[in-house]
Amino acid sequence: MKVSLIGGTGFVGSHIVPALIAAGHVPRLLMRDPASGSGLPLDQCEQVRGEVSDPVALAECVQGADAVIYLIGILREFPSQGITFEDLQFRGVERTLEACRAAGVGRFVLMSANGVKPDGTAYQRSKHQAEEAVKASCPRWTIFRPSVIFGPPQGRMEFCTQLRRDIIDSPLPAPLFYPGLLPTGAGAFQLAPVAIADVAQAFVRALTRPETEGRTFELCGPEPKSWKEILETIAAAVDKRKLMLPAPAIGVKTAAALFDRFPWFPISRDQLTMLMEGNVCADASAYPLLGIDPQPFTVESLRYLRAG
């Protein structure tokens, strides 16, 4: 199959592209510039220069494709720089769907996010809007909702690498966030980190499995972990002992209200809200359907952090 990827040069795409090639498919990448494809096997990929805001480049990228995968996602928006959830996570999907309709491409796979909802944060709302647009516009769609994703970053932003840099390697104690005024349950909210190798295989295998069409799948690791357990596992993976102290979420949100418009501030109010909501899955049906045995989140599976 010829598979066009929108956002294929990011972290998730950098793992999906070689998985596509290994499965005998031909990836076609929409690329802003050659540097964005660093580390990818570009000699085995077709390339189209342009951005998701360019309808001409989108049309060229999807023309003649058997399937399109949309992977663009951002963790924070900076409206003053023209970087918004609505534009990249919703309007970009709309523009890509329009290009697919014009080119007669009916197979569309979307990377959404676990926990999306119509009345949540701006991030969650834009992802939900994208899902609804895909369902309304594409006859053969599949949506994946991964939890937080871990794995070798390959020079890109990755969950555990960022936590190591911002928290584990910091001289400050690691924050165990808690709601309210008392530190009851500090750091107890749960996430279910999913391995990037499993996410990549889910996307690739779904392309040739008609039974995945018209369905939304959650992708989580096999065992939820508390925030405290996640930080402890990352610290152990890099042979560090880390002091951890309860931290009131209200204090961090107050600081974020002043500074989260600046890229140097480590977390936004919405990010903290979503983090403390937890991120686990109620449905693991994708794995048996696609023949995937999900990898656990352990010290051994985080050995790549030692290279950081």
Where do the PLM segments sit?
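Conserved glycine-rich Rossmann-like NAD(P)H-binding loop of the short-chain dehydrogenase/reductase
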Residues: H25-R32
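Rossmann-fold NAD(P)-dependent oxidoreductase module
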Residues: H15-A19, A99, A133, T233
